């Protein structure tokens, strides 16, 4: 499950904005939807190394189990696999469409006022719920409601579905988002004066902070910082022009190093909670950190040498 978190919950989501929230933030600020396909070489490089490591670890564990007499029982017929609830694919498409619309609608004239700002509902002070964001929220909630109401309860029971993991992650990350705001505000105010001008510097700074401050707002802070450095060549966003190599470094730092801790990315803790509920032993917070330092950090050092120097 640790390597599942490494590869599926984090690194594997780098190819589109719907794969990981940091890239969605970039999409909403003018980065083309399919630009992140540029990260495919980095993804393949990391995936091959980590899958190779996993293969040898798994083979060693398998041989040890066989030596201890823990052989698989092949005398019983295998479990027949059925796919039920296929109509939920419709609701999944609704959610994907909502995410894509959240990045495309703000660029349309109908959603902008005379000053060029995105129209919305002012909540308090300078906080505004934009109409594209409202449409996204409504579409996702409608899809979730329809899925919940139209899916047979027996399917959820057989899948051992509970609200426990969702509740645990929601409470934890509400606390993280509240307590991280001062640190993010300091970074936003002083980011341009940090002296970060090289891709590898952005990769490691974005990544290290993403490990503990959640990768989505951290990505946005450093994308804003890069856009304010005054570059004239690269990707043009609403935050400024960012060199392609630096944009790749920020994107990979946020997405990949969100895997360094359970709190670097919400799905990490979700996987841990679901695993715990189903009796699968997972490392503690610092135990997981030891896994990531042992296996991920050396890979990220190789990333630096190959892609970001």
Language-model segments: which ranges?
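Small-residue-rich segments of transmembrane alpha-helices in multi-pass membrane proteins
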Residues: 5-13, 71-78, 165-178, 203, ...
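Juxtamembrane and boundary regions of transmembrane helices in multi-pass small-molecule transporters
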Residues: 15, 34-80, 256-309
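Transmembrane helical segments that form the transport core of multi-pass membrane transport proteins
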Residues: 94-229
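Predominantly late transmembrane helices and immediately cytosolic-facing juxtamembrane segments
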Residues: 46, 50-75, 83, 144-154, ...
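Membrane-interfacial helix-loop connectors
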Residues: 1-4, 8, 25-41, 181-260, ...
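Hydrophobic core segments of alpha-helical transmembrane domains in multi-pass membrane transport
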Residues: 9, 44-56, 88-103, 139-150, ...
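Transmembrane helix-loop junctions at the membrane interface of multipass transporters and ion channels
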Residues: 15, 20-36, 98-109, 307-308
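Long, contiguous bundles of hydrophobic transmembrane helices that form the permeation core
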Residues: 50-118
